Amino acid sequence: MTHDTRSLYSQLSSIDSLLHQADIQTLVDGYGQTFIVEHLRKLQEEARIIIRQNNQLPQWHDNWAEELKNRIALQRKAAIKPVFNLTGTVLHTNLGRALMAESAIEAVSQVMRSPATLEYSLDGASRGHRDRAIADLLCELTGAEDACIVNNNAAAVLLMLATVAPDKEVVVSRGELVEIGGAFRIPDVMCQAGCRLKEVGTTNRTHLKDYRNAINENTGLLMKVHTSNYSIQGFTAEVEGTQLAALGKEMNLPTAIDLGSGSMTNLAALGLPSEPMPQDYLQQGIDLVTFSGDKLLGGPQAGIILGKKAWIEAIQHHPLKRALRVDKMTLAALDATLRLYQQPEKMIKDIPTLRLLTRTQTEIHDMAQRLLPHFQAYYGDNYHITISSCASQIGSGSLPIESLPSAALTFAAKDGKGSQLDALAAHWRNLEKPIIGRITDGRLWLDLRCLEDENALIQALSL
């Protein structure tokens, strides 16, 4: 160690002397002495490393309190923060999928603040079942005999397969071996559930006879998987739910369909592309139907299993059910969301997913015109800003080939450099409430379909 290095080390303030500084004492009052001392020690160690490696004091040596305050603020920033979703994808998986209805938010808030009847029966002051109230509501809405709720649709499929067809073959069309995000594949789920996949048909055409010919003494389930995140078009054929249900009844085998997204209302009646509903397959005679809670339903993340009472009871008693069950907050949000489906006249207005999906291009274009002057004031010197027609996506693997006419503010760098667009997108991502758009075709696009609070966006630009 050189004389200069020793001199630099000697200039480092002690913990005790730092704690007597007024600004640091203020931080102690706010966060507690243990917390502050721990962070001061980390700063001291970092300072020693800087001296050892660079033979100089850290830049913040003369203002430990300010550096400490900045470090604490950075550390205490929320890991998950609200953003403006202007990507054009309504159910954006990476941005949290469905927004909650206000009644669902209030319901979650209430059960977080107070004990609740999660597994308590007020009728007999005894233990109840956490799924029961929501199961009754689902049965009322869909005509199912019973229902089960778990933490997502992948869990619903896993639990259903593990209960219905352990150590058995599950017959599925080759064209329905779906992979969802994160390389999560139906064949892999079957393997984890202890089932054996029996592929039938071809990628583009599967017939009822393919299912029939695959049945043997090892068959445990006849299954369909709705290809919600891709579409096979052209020379195609698939087995209808009524056909599969009839074959299952004839051969005394259970039948099931994994809907993936699953809509609880007729989207076509709302002017949207059609998506199969669970109640349709139940009416066709399918024994079990699974789907998601946080996609087209517009509720919290959950997996829902509907179907025959005997099978649902068996599913409820499977050991995996306890590992996959949902908490009181999910159940409260799901309950409140489902109750909105009992009021069709309020449903579209009160469920954000349906409200956003049904917005007209004219409405969105009018919003773009109101916002354009504000963006020009901030960014007009460096960017050409225009209003452009565009196509929104539903997202989360729902209706993959369908799109919704929308409108966007688009930005093109006046110097023609793509790096300027990257810089602008990065700037927006670093705002207190980040603005998330997309760069395509040499422009930065802000699709306004999912924007409902114009003033909040304008305010975000000024921060």
Swiss-Prot record:
Catalyzed reactions per annotation: L-seryl-tRNA(Sec) + selenophosphate + H(+) = L-selenocysteinyl-tRNA(Sec) + phosphate
GO biological process: conversion of seryl-tRNAsec to selenocys-tRNAsec; selenocysteine incorporation
One Gene Ontology molecular-function label: L-seryl-tRNA(Sec) selenium transferase activity
Gene Ontology cellular-component terms listed: cytoplasm
Modified residues (N6-(pyridoxal phosphate)lysine): 295
Keyword list, A-Z: Cytoplasm, Protein biosynthesis, Pyridoxal phosphate, Selenium, Transferase
Gene3D superfamilies named among the record's database cross-references: 3.90.1150.180, Type I PLP-dependent aspartate aminotransferase-like (Major domain)
Alphabetized Pfam families for the sequence: Se-cys_synth_N, SelA
InterPro entries the record matches: PyrdxlP-dep_Trfase, PyrdxlP-dep_Trfase_major, SelA-like, SelA_trans, SelA_trans_N_dom
Cofactor dependence: pyridoxal 5'-phosphate
Record keyword Nucleotidyltransferase present: no
Pathway as given in its UniProt record: Aminoacyl-tRNA biosynthesis; selenocysteinyl-tRNA(Sec) biosynthesis; selenocysteinyl-tRNA(Sec) from L-seryl-tRNA(Sec) (bacterial route): step 1/1
EC number: 2.9.1.1
Compartments (UniProt record): Cytoplasm
Top EC class for this record: transferase
Assigned protein family: Belongs to the SelA family.
Physiological role: Converts seryl-tRNA(Sec) to selenocysteinyl-tRNA(Sec) required for selenoprotein biosynthesis.
Subunit and partners: Homodecamer; pentamer of dimers. Binds only one seryl-tRNA(Sec) per dimer.
NCBIfam families: selA
Official protein name in the record: L-seryl-tRNA(Sec) selenium transferase
Organism the protein comes from: Proteus mirabilis (strain HI4320)
